[in-house]
């Protein structure tokens, strides 16, 4: 009789454990929903660029009371840091949940929200080549700016038109690997607000398409005066896609961070360049933030330092440069205006943002 009771108890325990076993082996589990906190905060990781002189990727880990939200702002070049950083994040979350033995179980999914500021290879190649197809990730949504209408009839070098090449690959990969994820494409001059697990995000679309009409003429006249047609043909598609960068501002309480993509600002004697127009349209007071990702990586000694320091950075704020050599280029310009900066050529730059403070370890 005692043996019968013993086996009945074993059978009962097995039946009770069966749902959990089935979940672990067959039903996708969101790791994000298993991470909750009473101390809301956003951890920003501007990823190391010292091994890739021109790559741009940032992770925002939004720790909320109900879940963790992972926001990927661009993704950088393929085979750079972003993909491995996300795999390591998933591994760390599993370890924190005492689930390290499930590292190879694809049912334990890390959910990602993607933002593509513009469609250049150094910003989004990792998204379509590594991150979106990865079996360990679920894409919740992709946000992107409108595509330029710049002609693709070989008037210009079409291979340099990121919207014609890399944007197409990004959308194709989304259809193949994340068919259920919504893709949000903003209209020109549109601002779009969406909630995060803590705080909120606001997207600012380019106010006009610099690839057509009078604005295309403007780009030619201002940035390529007197240049040979072959040089304009090769470089103009790059400038247009940069000028059409979408901006992103993430805020939590009184604190915020602003991403400006690769917006164009090259002339100290003009106040009507694409960067100037974005600030004028959306308003400096609306855009001003504690952390500003410097336009175009900080790749040159351009006049963007003045509007960044005087219009976009809050008092005591920090600009983030994201390319090799930026310290000697944009960094020197920022120093003229007494603006603080850090650079990812020194390694990944990490900030913790709460509703009241922004700190660096």
What are these regions (language model features)?
Residues 9-19:
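Bacterial N-terminal signal peptides
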Residues 18-26:
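Sec-dependent signal peptide cleavage junction
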Residues 50-55, 61-107, 115-135, 210-315, ...:
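Active-site-proximal loop/helix segments of hydrolase catalytic cores
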Residues 80-83, 150-153, 326-332:
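Short, charged/polar "capping" segments at the starts of alpha-helices
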Residues 113-115, 141-143, 320:
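A structural signal for isolated positions on well-ordered beta-strands in alpha/beta enzyme cores
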Residues 299-301, 306-361:
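C-terminal regions of proteins
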